[in-house]
Structures are given as C-alpha cells and as structure tokens.
Amino acid sequence: MALGGALTLAPLPAGPAEAAPARSGRRPTLRHGSAARAGLLPSHLRRLVADAETFLAPSPKHPWYAGAVLLAGRGGTVALHRPIGMAVRYRAYDEKTDTGVEFPPGEQIPMAEDTVFDLASVSKLFTSILAVQQIERGALGLEAKVSSYLPDFARAGKQDITIRQLLTHTSGFRAWIPLYGAPTHEDKLQLIWTERPVSAPGAAYLYSDLNLISLQLVLERVTGRTLDTLLRDEITAPLGMRRTRYNPPASWRPKIAATEDARAPWSGLDRGLVWGEVHDENAFALGGVAGHAGVFSDAWDLAVLGRTLLNGGVYGRARILSPESVELMFTDFNTAFPGDEHGLGFELYQHWYMGAMATPRTAGHTGFTGTSLVLDPTTDSFLIVLGNSVHPVRSWRSGSAPRVAAANHMARAVPVRPARGRTAWFSGTALSTTATLALPALDTSAGRARLRCALWWDIEPAADVLVLEASADGGTSWQPVPFTTFRRGQHPEQHPSGSVTGWSGRVWHGLTADVPAARELTLRWRYTTDRLYVGRGCYADGLRVEDAGDLLFDERRPADAARVQAVGWTREAD
C-alpha cells in the first residue's frame, strides 16, 4: 500500500491492531461486563483501584491528583470503570502555605464515570490520526517536506523537515516556545516560521509541542477545514464520541474536572482557577484549538477510540483508518533512538507510564494534566487513567507513579496460563529485588546432564535480568549457564550469557541447557529488578534435569518439588 505516494508498504502480516480480533474475525464494540468475561483476573483489578486511591492522599507530600476515573478492559468488555476522589475540590492555591483553598463541601464535585477531562497532550493522538487519514487518502505525503504545504515554514533552517519527523518528534524543534506572549495570531505564526531547530532533522529525538502545532497548520491548509471541524467530522461523529471536542460549552462545566489555579510565576498566564477551558497556555492563546493540546473527553470515549485502533481502524459500522494505517501508528519509526520508540503519533514501549503493559507494540500517550491512554495489542487490552493532577497547582505532582501502578496491575490481570499442569513458578514483579528459584544439589559429575523446562519472560530491557546460574560450592559462588530457547515456527536462539532481558513475545519458550559437571551442583534462576520499573515478570514450568535418559530431577515428582528453594518466586495458576 502506498500512503501519500511517498511510503510504499509491502504486504503486512497481521499487525498489532489485527492480532487479537483476527482469531475470531470479530471487531468488538464496547460494553460493560465482568472481569471473567473480559478474560481478566478480578483480584488484580481490585488492587488497581486500591492502589489508585492511595494517591488521593499525600504521596509523599501532596496528593498526586484530587481525583481520577479509571477504565480498563480487554476485547469488547470494559471490566473496570471507576471514579475516585473529586473532580472539583479547590477554588485556589495558597503559595505562602503551599496548601489548596477548598470550596465549601457543598460546592465540591465528586468524580463520575462520565467526568470530562482536559486531555492535554493526549490531544496529540487525535491530530496524528487526522494526519494519517490524510496520508491514507493521498492528500499528505509521509516523507513530504512540511514546507511543500507551508512555504513560510522553510525559514530558519526548517526546509528539510518532513511530515514523518513531526509525527515522531525527530524534527529538531525544541520542546516549546511561549506563543501566548505574541499579541496576534499572525505574530504567533511568525514565531513558528522564524523558529530555528536545535538539531538537524532526523538527527535526534526531542519531544516538542511545536511538531503537532505545525501539523495542525498543515492539516488546515490541505483540507481547508479547521482542526476542531476535522476532529468532529473525521473522528468523533463517525465513532459516536459525543463527549469529545475542543472548547466544551458552558453547559458542560459541572461535569468537567477542574485543573489549575493558573497564576504567575508557575503559569505563563494569570487566569485563576481553570475549569472548563484548556489548561495549556499556548492552546488557550490559540483559541482553545491546537494540535498539541485542547481536546476534552471522558474515559468511555477514549476507550472507544482505543478499541477502534485495536480493531484495525473500525468500530461498529464506522471505519476511520485502514488496518495498514493503524499498523504505521503502532510501528517504531525511531529505531535510531533506542528508548524513544515512536509510531506515527503514538509513543511505544515506554515503561515510565505503561509499566508492565509495555511491549514493543504497546502504544499510548500521556497528558500534563494527569491523563494517559495505553493500548496493548499483544493482549488486546486497554487502560485509561484520567486524573486532575494539576488541581490546584502543577507543582504538587511529579512523575507517573499512579499510571505505572495501574498499568502493573492491569498487566498482572491478564493471566499467563502454565505450560503444563495447574501451576508454574512466577518471579513476581517487585521492585529493587532479587528473586531466586533453586533446585536441590544434584550429582552431574558424569558430564551429560541437561536442564529442560518451559520459560516465559517479559522483563524491563537492560535494567532487569533473568539469569540461569550454577554453583558447585554450596552457593558461595555462582556462574552463568548458557542455554538455548526455542518456539514453534522459529529458529532456536542461543543465550551464551545465560541470561535474558526484554520482551519474549509473551509466549512460552522451550529451554535446554547443558549443565556443568560437579559432584554437588545447584542450579537456580535469579531475577533481578531495579528500583524504577518492571515488566510482567518471568515464569518457569516443567523443570527437569536428565542425564543420558536418567532423571536427576523432575518437579512433577512430589519429593523433588518439595526440595525446590524459592525466594520471591511462588507457584501460580495465572
């Protein structure tokens, strides 16, 4: 398929948006249902909510958010849709005491399932979808230069920046500039035209609001429609997203989560409590309609958008993208910048907010106001966390701990069934830990012993590691044991370091390892994690050690199983 006459795709295998639904040929629409119906574990969804509620309290000094709406599901089932905390709590921020000035209790508004949020940078996904639609239709070229649509854009060294580089944040633009300081719309445009990139196009990854503001200008030029009209015509109306728009009307205000008491010096504009208007200063100065921020929506509407993409661009009778276009949004274009994986508009494989849901195909985005969307095509699951974390002031929150905690629980809610039998050994997902699974000492002195088992791993790449080790001196010293893994339809993979990290496809692998010769040899798995993030963890099943046909160890034998020493590992059915 040729998109915009610039990028030609060879026939694609079933991509992330196709994978899960394609097995049954279904393209589900959403409805509420039980965790069991969704194929999720209810205990972990309950823990997701409980953990999210802890961030309503000081964490550590102030609440991370005043409230949130949590939505999680799999396939066509929304198994969790829970409001917590307050949508409107504070009328002001007292910088002298670093406290929030609360509304009287009768004027505070609790979160509801349909509370509408200022999405902040999650808005970038809508702009990106609109751009990919135009690429698909041939009105926009993915590798075309931006200046071919906007001649003024060519100034100040920007003449070679492409549409793809805007979508993947590799244009060279700095993070942002204060457009709100320019008095007129034309003056704001002049700031963009005269802005000089800080790096050559394609030379570095640098996340920038200017990329999506520029893309807005391109879209409006090639379509002859404003961005808010495009959003309505091309996305929200076809998908029935009735609570998603720019510039919500005043009648929506009681159902909108408040954001910040915006005043200098922490805000670029003195506006007081921002409630029902876009929080971002540049988007506000652009009339509330901007490519980088300004969209308001609720959790259900975002779930519909996510389900549409996981369906390959279709929801019910409405198709907004082709499957090939969705594939481009979920495919990493930033292979030259490891750690900054990015599809067209979507961020990929970002543990810092996707937590254990992160895979090379997991797509999502966050917003400064406390919002996030995560889509995992490998498990056909989705998670939305909408919080008002700048209420009453942006300095009260830092990091993405609530997003990570929610994603970790959501990932754990997707069961991993044992390769054999009813249970398998599971490493857990604790931070800053070393979990070990040790077999009893075995006599392998004949030199023919071999370990066989099934292994499943999803590990934060590079930072965390699973190692197979052996000790011949009672555990005083350990040496790595090289091994080979294999799965049906693929060539065996050698692991000469005796270790694995990263993502294995979330499938079971067979494993064999030649065991060192020793009179008393102890084998163990060691899973080590750092203090920041974890993957879904590791599973081992069917552990057995053979010596020329003789079984030295088989965990299916109760006597052998009883001699396994597990620290941090547990037997789990899922």
Predicted regions and their residues:
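N-terminal export signals
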Residues: 1-16
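C-terminal segment of N-terminal export signals and the immediately downstream linker at the start
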Residues: 13-34
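Short, surface-exposed loop or secondary-structure junction motifs
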Residues: 82, 87-89, 93-100, 156-360
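A short, well-structured edge-of-sheet supersecondary motif
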Residues: 53-110, 142, 180-181, 372-374, ...
